[in-house]
Swiss-Prot record:
Residues 4-50 form a coiled coil. Belongs to the AAA ATPase family. The keyword Nucleotide-binding applies. GO terms for molecular function: ATP binding; ATP hydrolysis activity. Homohexamer. Assembles into a hexameric ring structure. The gene is arc. One of its GO terms (biological process) is proteasomal protein catabolic process. This is AAA ATPase forming ring-shaped complexes.
């Protein structure tokens, strides 16, 4: 009996010990958790008690060897300071232009990311390995310090992100000033897309493509390729299309081993109100062209680069012709020196386009500069048929035979429909018809108008339950489109400046003086 009681008490005590041990483990875990939370709270209190940190831009070390450097030059709070570097940072780990955090006593305690805000500036010239001259948005020159990551990669014309207070360039913005003015990819326009200009296309292919497709023959005959081509003529007749097709044809002919580049420079975008800026941009464009032309190819062949100046008369005017500015007296010589100056221009061809060739300085158009001059005339009847066919393919819904439809439109477009009478001082009056102002751009617009009329007719037919669906573009649509196009052209150009009429009409005598213009309007 006593033994049974003793065993029962012993078992009860064991259970109590197990419960106490379990409770003790829980208390220990709670105590550990409380200690951790207390440490976190103490750390937060210490962090809140710390003074505010200051950020600065690292300018460089003050010692001789990176391994032993613990002094640094930083720019902070509007002044340059020499500060200490925390032992927790690896020696030599800081880079010029990097943002750093300064702790108590202005000690560098943390290396942060590079500065990513600031002003944009254009690099003009390198000064050694770590400095450069830039031009800011106000046109002022400034000497800045290049960040370590930029010292081997930037070149003249690049756009840099500059921290204005410290004067450190921290990043290259991947859009150079030349890239803002040019388009280096090859246009997707072929000669087959151009109608009515077979003669002009043949001339420019002989002038531009042959030197690159058959360089061995040119070397054999000691013949230098032309440096430039001038495309001139009335507006809207395909000058820009021809230039794009040249670049595309060269790219296709030479293949991937020596791709061509097409730098499309819009004349007005080169203009700048600051003295010397336009000339500098021209230098940058030709410098970029030389770099592209000198890039090695897979088979060692030549890499053609085409610089296309659109609206050339806007910037390269005859020297001395300026009324409120004499800008052309320095801009024109800059182009002349690039074309045939001391620095050789190899594998680079300049193509200019203008509809006011009489305004361009004669020195630019002499042989040795723009060697080839090709006039792009207004399309003839046959040329108009080819242009209609380019914009009006068989796949477009139409009524009847497409060829007959195009012939009808051409006859309507070239019908005798008087537009204006020009009165000359020393010659008989001359009647100009609407056909005298036909251009490729006008034909393209006529086709677009006819397509819109056909679409509207199809939509109207779809809303009504009766009637057959329209067959597509009809002769009536083309007639309406031609009439609308000619009606809109009735007062463009206006009679306010009679000389403008003589300049846009081919065949007018150069010495003829227009004394009056009589608009005759559209005849039904």
């Amino acid at each position: 009996m006593n033994d049974a009681t003793h065993s029962q008490e012993l078992g009860q005590q064991r259970r109590q010990i197990e419960q106490l041990a379990e409770r003790n483990a829980k208390l220990a875990a709670l105590l550990k958790d409380a200690r951790t939370k207390l440490q976190q709270m103490l750390a937060e209190v210490d962090a809140l008690a710390e003074p505010a940190s200051t950020y600065g831009v690292f300018l460089g070390y003050s010692g001789r060897a990176h391994d032993s450097r613990r002094d640094a030059e930083v720019y902070t709070n509007g002044r340059a300071m020499r500060v200490k570097i925390s032992p927790n940072l690896e020696p030599g780990s800081l880079k010029v232009g990097q943002q750093v955090r300064l702790g108590e006593g202005f000690v560098i305690v943390e290396a942060c990311a590079p500065v990513n805000t600031g002003a944009l500036a254009t690099l003009q010239e390198r000064l050694g390995t770590d400095r450069a001259v830039v031009i800011n948005s106000s046109g002022e020159e400034q000497v800045i310090l290049l960040a370590a990551a930029l010292r081997d990669t930037v070149r003249a014309g690049d756009t840099l992100l500059v921290e204005p207070k410290s004067g450190v360039a921290t990043e290259r913005v991947h859009k150079t000033e030349v890239a803002q003015l040019t388009l280096e990819e090859v246009p997707d326009v072929s000669y087959e897309d151009i109608g009515g200009l077979d003669e002009q296309i043949s001339l420019i292919r002989d002038s531009v493509e042959l030197p690159f497709l058959h360089p061995e023959l040119y070397r054999k005959y000691d013949l230098q390729p032309p440096k430039g081509v001038l495309l001139y003529g009335p507006p809207g007749c395909g000058k820009t299309l021809i230039a794009k097709a040249v670049a595309h044809s060269l790219s296709v002919s030479l293949g991937a081993t020596a791709p061509s580049y097409f730098l499309n420079v819009k004349g007005p975008e080169l203009l700048n109100k600051f003295v010397g800026e336009t000339e500098r941009r021209i230098r940058l464009i030709f410098e970029r062209a030389r770099e592209l032309a000198s890039e090695p190819t897979e088979d060692g062949s030549q890499r053609p680069v085409i610089i296309f100046f659109d609206e050339m008369e806007s910037i390269f005017r005859t020297r001395g012709s300026g009324v409120s500015s004499d800008m052309e007296t320095t801009v024109v010589p800059q182009l002349l020196t690039e074309l045939d100056g001391v620095e050789k221009l190899s594998n680079v061809i300049v193509i200019g386009a203008t509809n006011r060739e009489e305004l361009i300085d004669p020195a630019i158009m002499r042989p040795g500069r723009l060697d080839i001059k090709i006039r792009v005339n207004r399309p003839t009847k046959q040329g108009a048929r080819e242009i209609f066919a380019r914009h009006f393919p068989e796949s477009v819904p139409h009524e009847g035979d497409l060829s007959q439809l195009i012939d009808t439109a051409v006859e309507d477009l070239y019908a005798e429909r008087p537009f204006v009478t020009l009165h000359f001082a020393n010659a008989d009056p001359r009647v100009l018809h609407y056909r005298d102002f036909v251009s490729g751009a006008m034909i393209a617009n006529i086709v677009s108008r006819a397509k819109k009329l056909a679409i509207k007719e199809a939509l109207d037919a779809a809303t009504t339950s009766e009637g057959a669906q329209p067959a597509g573009i009809t002769a009536a649509h083309l007639h309406q489109a031609i009439a609308a196009e000619q009606a809109e052209s009735e007062y463009v150009p206006t009679s306010a400046n009679p000389e403008e009429w003589a300049k846009i009409v081919a065949g007018t005598s150069a010495g003829a003086h227009v004394t009056g213009v009589e608009l005759m309007g559209v005849k039904p």
